Amino acid sequence: MTPATRNNDSAVAVADAFDDTGDGPPTAARFAALAACWRQPDDDLQAALAAETDTTVDAQSLRAEYTRLFVGPGPSQSPPYESVYRDGERDADLGPVYGSSTQAVARWYSEYGLQPAASESAPPDHLATELEFAAYLREHEGAETLEQFLTEHPRNWVESFARRVRDADPKPFYRTLLNVTVDTLARADTPL
């Protein structure tokens, strides 16, 4: 998303995110780090995770798990897109990618003069992009604006997404990331 938090160093964002504990509201750094972790894993994420956890992160394994859970082959078990969970005809049906929810979240970005980076191939309602926008709102706008966005968008679908991810029996990295993300979205309405 430009301009926004993607220019943060991944290692700093990951470190800040997971040092952010307690009952207070999540920081912009926490939202940004979560966004980085929900994207297709790359060497920068691997290096940041390895530096912050003092463990070896197997990038190939992380990429394979990301692909299994969120990409395919075949139909993705847990697509990380809002429209898939909100734009189906019935609660049990998955909706289309690039549905009406995609357009609604894109209007939020546009209202603040933001748009996904040109290099971004995922739809604007990808969980990582929504979390990145939450980081922007936390840093540049009031808590009320952030709360409105979270209520209208990620909180409206992340529980359905979380159930599908859990049903797919994710490896520890994605199970933990999912739990931290759900907790972060729940805590975000804590006053600044």
UniProtKB/Swiss-Prot annotation:
Gene3D superfamilies the record matches: TorD-like
UniProtKB keywords: Chaperone
Domain of life from the UniProt record: Archaea
InterPro entries for the chain: DMSO/NO3_reduct_chaperone, TorD-like_sf, TorD/DmsD_chaperones
Disruption phenotype annotation: Cells lacking this gene fail to grow under anaerobic conditions using either DMSO or TMAO as terminal electron acceptors.
Induction comment from the UniProt entry of this chain: By anaerobic conditions. Its expression is under the control of DmsR.
SUPFAM superfamilies assigned: TorD-like
Keyword Chaperone among record annotations: yes
Family: Belongs to the TorD/DmsD family.
General function of this protein: May be involved in the biogenesis/assembly of dimethyl sulfoxide (DMSO) reductase.
Protein name per Swiss-Prot or TrEMBL: Putative dimethyl sulfoxide reductase chaperone
Organism: Halobacterium salinarum (strain ATCC 700922 / JCM 11081 / NRC-1) (Halobacterium halobium)
